[in-house]
């Protein structure tokens, strides 16, 4: 994408070095609707000479928010939210104030945690329209979610039901970034669920850690077969990546006994003091060190 605009890109060891004397508009066709690729090409194209068309662009709300931000600074971007984004380059940008949208994955993580611990929480400030696919899955699992004037009330008083099939896919379908968290919920469900990962390879690293806590999950290529168990048990587990770490925190709050989550730096990449967020909701969780969280049964 950036090379099509005229950038010289070289790999040097663990670094990627990009140089350009001038960027020129071009048609960029993405083989996959990558959020990061779409955003980087959009940002590069706003000051490029001429028009850039991104075909096969990602459609996530963050793309639409970036378009609003860039246009407020003087850019000329249109089409965000569709599969074609068009950018007409401008000579310069100006500063300004901009309020970003709520993080839908953080909101979704909270919703799943409430469901897994059988809580009752009202959530303000999120955007339910960005969470439609998650809400649909959780309602199938028997979780009560009421939305009124943008305010969500999530309540769960019984064991969740299995969901026959959940498939990750680019927005507006079910997000891969909530796959691990929802798998934790389904590990406690009554029945067998199937989670199919179609976005990233190797994104089931949390399965082994959940199984340490008593989950019954079998992985076959990009499919995870989840046979729900009545309860999980506290253990020492490792956050192998950002969303896996969040899932293990949820598991620790839902499990019987004491859970230690290690390698917390992965979680800190996407959640600001996750332990404080869950403590405000009644979770018994503390940060023992920069790399260890300790969670106790929140029920």
Question: What residues fall within each predicted segment?
Answer:
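Structural preference for solvent-exposed beta-strand-turn elements
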Residues: 1-299
């Amino acid at each position: 994408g950036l090379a099509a605009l005229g950038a010289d890109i070289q790999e040097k060891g663990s670094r990627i070095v990009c140089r350009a004397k001038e960027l020129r508009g071009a048609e960029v066709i993405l083989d996959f609707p990558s959020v990061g690729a779409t955003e980087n090409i959009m940002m590069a194209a706003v000051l490029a000479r001429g028009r850039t068309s991104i075909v096969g662009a990602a459609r996530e709300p963050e793309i639409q928010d970036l378009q609003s931000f860039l246009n407020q600074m003087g850019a000329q971007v249109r089409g965000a939210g569709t599969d074609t984004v068009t950018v007409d380059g401008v000579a310069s940008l100006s500063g300004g104030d901009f309020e970003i949208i709520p993080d839908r994955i953080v909101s979704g993580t909270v919703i799943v945690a409430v469901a897994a611990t059988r809580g009752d929480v009202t959530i303000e400030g999120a955007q339910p329209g960005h969470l439609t696919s998650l809400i649909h899955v959780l309602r199938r699992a028997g979780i009560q979610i009421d939305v009124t004037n943008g305010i969500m009330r999530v309540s769960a008083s019984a064991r969740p039901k299995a969901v026959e099939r959940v498939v990750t896919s680019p927005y507006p379908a079910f997000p891969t970034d909530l796959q691990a968290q929802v798998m934790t919920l389904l590990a406690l469900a009554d029945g067998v669920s199937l989670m199919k990962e179609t976005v990233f390879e190797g994104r089931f690293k949390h399965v082994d850690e959940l199984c340490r806590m008593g989950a019954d999950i079998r992985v076959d290529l990009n499919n995870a077969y989840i046979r729900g168990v009545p309860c999980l048990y506290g253990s020492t587990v490792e956050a192998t990546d950002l969303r896996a770490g969040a899932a293990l925190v949820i598991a620790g709050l839902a499990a019987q006994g004491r859970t230690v989550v290690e390698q917390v730096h992965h979680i800190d990449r996407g959640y600001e003091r996750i332990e404080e967020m869950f403590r405000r909701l009644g979770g018994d969780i503390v940060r023992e060190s920069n790399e260890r969280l300790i969670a106790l049964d929140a029920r």
